[in-house]
Amino acid sequence: MAKGFYISKTLGILGILLGVAAVCTIIALSVVYAQEKNRNAENSATAPTLPGSTSATTATTTPAVDESKPWNQYRLPKTLIPDSYRVILRPYLTPNNQGLYIFQGNSTVRFTCNQTTDVIIIHSKKLNYTLKGNHRVVLRTLDGTPAPNIDKTELVERTEYLVVHLQGSLVEGRQYEMDSQFQGELADDLAGFYRSEYMEGDVKKVVATTQMQAADARKSFPCFDEPAMKAMFNITLIYPNNLIALSNMLPKESKPYPEDPSCTMTEFHSTPKMSTYLLAYIVSEFKNISSVSANGVQIGIWARPSAIDEGQGDYALNVTGPILNFFAQHYNTSYPLPKSDQIALPDFNAGAMENWGLVTYRESSLVFDSQSSSISNKERVVTVIAHELAHQWFGNLVTVAWWNDLWLNEGFASYVEYLGADYAEPTWNLKDLMVLNDVYRVMAVDALASSHPLSSPADEIKTPDQIMELFDSITYSKGASVIRMLSSFLTEDLFKKGLSSYLHTYQYSNTVYLDLWEHLQKAVNQQTAVQPPATVRTIMDRWILQMGFPVITVNTNTGEISQKHFLLDSKSNVTRPSEFNYIWIAPIPFLKSGQEDHYWLDVEKNQSAKFQTSSNEWILLNINVTGYYLVNYDENNWKKLQNQLQTDLSVIPVINRAQIIHDSFNLASAKMIPITLALDNTLFLVKEAEYMPWQAALSSLNYFTLMFDRSEVYGPMKRYLKKQVTPLFFYFQNRTNNWVNRPPTLMEQYNEINAISTACSSGLKECRDLVVELYSQWMKNPNNNTIHPNLRSTVYCNAIAFGGEEEWNFAWEQFRNATLVNEADKLRSALACSKDVWILNRYLSYTLNPDYIRKQDTTSTIISIASNVAGHPLVWDFVRSNWKKLFENYGGGSFSFANLIQGVTRRFSSEFELQQLEQFKADNSATGFGTGTRALEQALEKTRANIDWVKENKDAVFKWFTENSS
């Protein structure tokens, strides 16, 4: 599943400069709302009503839970192994006379008894069963022998089970089949089998679609809903004749539905053995464009008819074939299925989902309009497609046995997405962006004492909430970062060889992460050119089983090199023990006297002449930032690097110019170097035209904005930024012929946006005049938006910030009428840039109205308002006042609460705010925080660190900016 909560490069830059906090650090998904019970009931009553009390899903209640009973344990027992399912589903796309959208289903599951048992335990969630002989299921054997009689069936809500108690025992080795008939709500909760809605003109259209990961296949039909319980699935859908149906496999047969001639019944080919969370089926009025890849795979891009007609699926179609072919070569394994459908959904919780053969996306992650979408939108599409297609092998063909190893699925896909996208767009240098997008973003979280290791013991991850909490930036971005490091020190060829062996060995089955280490080690053992200092497992277990990362410190006078667990707050208490005592085995590529060399640090401290320098030479560690660690030097070497940057910055690689800025600011935050040294590392930016160093600087200085935009420090800080960015602004003004053209490369286009955003936010008059004029021209002629798509987020946000009610209302009207999701996203984010508190308060009230803001976008919109210094107190008051209501009514199991907590607390830097946060925790302890629990602890830790940092650095920072802003 792709990272859910996405902010474009442009919007991310705006966030840095206008106080909009960077909220991409944690994987964030949107608020899941309570089911609507009475909407549109007057329009139609064609769907059946839900059954009465005889088949209600009333849970079995007992005074105390007996944990010894298998149905009270969250993990399935090993007694039964599923072989196959036959599932028939009929979604009703109009509400019944209760006002509910529902679906009806029939399911037959075939399973083998692995251990003798007198109880069948299978997952079921929010399903109403039709009783058959006073029971919810019918059981039989395949060999004709009598099956045990059913004593009773019950639904256990806590563990989400349908439990079948038998009067006798199932026989080990014998196969059985169990039938059930059920109904469920086709709710708009973005989980399981759900509905998505969109407008076509004035007509509301409804889509029936799915999102099974992690534990919601059970909400669609009764199933053994764990990733290791692989089986074959035979899916049949019944739907109106004017619609189309899709599933993981190609249709096998379509025919009129005998009971209703207005409907079609389509049976799909049986799937290979696969996990329940990868199932998908969709009924809609969508259209598609298609092609056949070089390897004979049928490719389809599906979306709303208007989006397809306007060519918004063309780019996705053009890159899908090459990316599929790239991964087939990269894995040395053919694509496992006959077709690859990808579909853009109006309402979708995550960024995308890798359902095998039918990948589902948010519209913004799949559709691209060449006239209205930005280069950032285009990059988003190609990287998310690459991420999801990477999963078709790694995750789908071979699947982790349990969610505690989710990092292997998502971390791997988050790494190779850059390789696949780079293959599709070879001129973009996308692989370099991983340093900014993943390595540096996740370090901000992994440097906290409340972080967690990539891999957890399986018995620590049991409940759906615990599973969902794993979908965070550690899993995705740290996973990607350490796999990138592994591939780098092994070499890509060796890495691919081990990977191919792993996939061939475990195809259609399940693994633990140690299986990958074993196959990579085999590849190492078969050659002699690459010989790490220890086995792959010995090296990598220290990166997988320990939280955090080291700071590598070099003394160029003595040649001493050492490592230490890096903590943003050096006073924080690390309560999680490590069997490795927070010592890592770190590969260290370095540059000295213009020559590259390599070193392994596998102890806490060592000494080598390699790290000693003469009076006129410097050393630079972690070339191209392939290692997942920070680097610190003695003061003398820092000064030499600064002198080099200010005399001839081209001698130092672009990525490492960004690294010098990033690492020094983090070291300063941890009080390992003076804050003024880190600030000195930005002086060379007046001569810098490359994107990565500028972006690293702006990301680092964003923390200063959050800490100081309510204090006197902010004035000289803005003046300094204005001084540094002015040459860059006029450089791009000249390069683009006064903003008429765009620079040729991706990185240049991103830095053009940096230049405009920074210049406007720091008060450069020429920039303000530019954005106000562009926005004014659009307001005069709303049907002719001449603002280039790359610049729209920047122009919209700044014009709204500089303007008032008229500018905001115009943007709101354009947002309401936007037909392209990328344009709507730009406007929705820019609407949070207003400086008028009453406007922001009104906008906040709109966020919980799904007629105004889609539910998938609620969290990101609230966070955008909170990240505006004028809107921050409004949102904090709102969250505190409404937490219980939000948590109980809007889905405690969604990812959004972690992001809400993180987004609202980013500015906290005073004792008063810490007290408020502690009181918030105490006041809501009974309600709980669900998947936001860890985020709350991180917020408390970060707030304490912020308080100390501001106290210690405010005067020095104020003095430095004052002295360097003239």
Swiss-Prot record:
Disulfide bonds: 760-767, 797-833
Molecular function as annotated in GO: alanyl aminopeptidase activity; metallopeptidase activity; zinc ion binding
Membrane protein topology class: Single-pass type II membrane protein
Ligand binding (substrate): 351-355
Gene Ontology biological process terms in this record: angiogenesis; angiotensin maturation; cell differentiation
Binding-site positions, Zn(2+): 387, 391, 410
Organism, scientific name: Mus musculus (Mouse)
Protein name: Aminopeptidase N
Membrane side Cytoplasmic: residue ranges: 1-8
